[in-house]
Amino acid sequence: MSNEFITFEKISRKSWKQLHQKSKPLLTQEELTSITSLNDNIDINDVVEVYLPLIHLIQVYKIAQENLSFSKSLFLKKDIQQRPFIIGISGSVAVGKSTTSRLLQLLLARTHKTSTVELVTTDGFLYPNSTLIKNNMLNRKGFPESYNMELLLNFLDTVKGGQTASAPVYSHEIYDIVPDQQQTFTNPDFLIIEGINVFQNQQNNRLYMSDYFDFSIYIDADSHHIEQWYLERFLSLLELAKHDPANYYTRYTSLPQNEAIAFAKKVWKTINLENLEKFIEPTRNRAELILHKAADHKIDEIYLKK
């Protein structure tokens, strides 16, 4: 961490867990296991020591947002419609964004029992493979230019305006957008938007996705740790694909393991690492909170914007 983080306060896990005294985890180990991504590592202690204080912090931000909205309505002398509290979550491929997103969704729903908590990933706003192939961009999938940013920003604007909005659905099994399938959102109380690109701005220099966020999180780790997690996940995906001929990864299951690992390392170096170093990691200081993971996937440090 460099002077890039001069606007953040560094908090150790030991200090962070003392900021919230509730000891009940709000979910069972079985529920936690069911929402944990392939090859991620999280347990009930992580929920109690890291995520319950985080839920409490999000509540602080939500109350502040509601107070500001109310004060604005008084100033403008008009009613302001209740709008979703939007949380953006970013980080590298294989760093554990999906686990964090699903866990926050569950914990927020358990904490705010009458609230609706929705989750959407920016994968759905990738251009379909057919479009990427047509424009000779398939090898740039995941890079900023492979996303339909106009569609994504329009979605966020519609949701933030309290209107019903729809998002395309992406499948990692087929490695493509699912044809004729949409995910619909009708003014939820909370919306979590997760993706590698949520702090990026590719096309319109005057508008960032983060302009719509009320809170934002970056999941951080050393790149050599993320590479190891990526390779482990790739091998696990190959195991699953052996029993599913329709799975995108089936085409790689016939490779000897050493060749499969060599292929995955090449993909990591030429695509994922380049994307991380050039486009993802440089945006992390736009987050309100950075959760740093150690080699064992455990969060060891927290950085909160001052």
Curated annotation (Swiss-Prot):
Substrates-to-products reaction catalysed: (R)-pantothenate + ATP = (R)-4'-phosphopantothenate + ADP + H(+)
Entry binding sites for ATP: G91, S92, V93, A94, V95, G96, K97, S98
Gene3D superfamilies named in the record: P-loop containing nucleotide triphosphate hydrolases
Main location: cytoplasm
GO biological process, alphabetically ordered: coenzyme A biosynthetic process
Swiss-Prot/TrEMBL keywords: ATP-binding, Coenzyme A biosynthesis, Cytoplasm, Kinase, Nucleotide-binding, Transferase
Subcellular location: Cytoplasm
Pathways involved: Cofactor biosynthesis; coenzyme A biosynthesis; CoA from (R)-pantothenate: step 1/5
CDD domains: PanK
GO CC field: cytoplasm
GO molecular function: ATP binding; pantothenate kinase activity
EC number: 2.7.1.33
A Pfam family hit: PRK
PANTHER family xrefs: URIDINE KINASE
Family classification: Belongs to the prokaryotic pantothenate kinase family.
NCBIfam families on file: panK_bact (TIGR00554)
Protein name: Pantothenate kinase
Species: Streptococcus equi subsp. equi (strain 4047)
Annotated gene: coaA
